A protein has these predicted regions:
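RNase H-like, Mg2+-dependent phosphodiesterase core
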Residues: 1-182
Length: 182
């Protein structure tokens, strides 16, 4: 039975979705690595190659779902969804927690070591980044196309000026936005 590599993108941002992908590669793909160390151009070039040469499942949780369920429950639900949609007996998730889901292994830095997890990393990141670029058109004042929803100074300044929008994770508290006594 083939290995299904699983990774996520968007666990830490203060806006946008959490995207998870599971991948079984049908063939070896050159150039795979942790999506965070690949250039955007390289990730975009690998994306269709991975889609054409794998069995995969991508699942996404909106900011509203993250606020309602919590990030850990979203991760668990994503893992379960991938395991239900991909036929494998060997599931490997990047990181050190199964989030209570049985039947999978974890490995720290698997996205840099295991091609199937690297491929999942690329699918998740490209899917999420494309979503943030589209959302930037709807909410241009936040600059999502640049920071992709992470808590950069530019993003925090935009929140201070415009307030939160519907894709912000209200459950993620930012010290920079908390009122101060002095």
């Amino acid at each position: 039975m083939s290995l299904c590599g699983i990774d996520e993108a968007g666990r830490g941002p203060i806006a946008g979705s959490l995207v998870m992908a599971g991948v079984i590669l049908n063939t070896e793909i050159a150039g795979l690595n942790d999506s965070k160390v690949l250039s955007e151009k390289k990730r975009e070039s690998l994306f269709p190659i991975i889609l054409e040469n794998s069995r995969y499942h991508i699942v996404s949780f909106t900011a509203h779902q993250i606020d309602e369920m919590g990030i850990s429950k979203c991760l668990a639900a994503g893992l379960e969804s991938i395991m239900q949609h991909i036929d494998s007996e060997d599931f490997l998730f990047d990181g050190n927690s199964t989030f209570g889901v049985r039947g999978l292994r974890t490995m720290i830095k698997a996205d840099a070591k295991i091609p199937e997890v690297s491929a999942a990393s690329v699918l998740a990141k490209v899917t999420r980044d494309r979503e943030m670029v589209e959302l930037a058109k709807k909410f241009p004042e936040y600059g999502f196309e640049g920071h992709k929803g992470y808590g950069t100074k530019t993003h925090v300044d935009a929140i201070k000026k415009h307030g939160y929008c519907e894709i912000h994770r209200k459950s993620f508290k930012l010290k920079a936005l908390e009122p101060t006594l002095f």
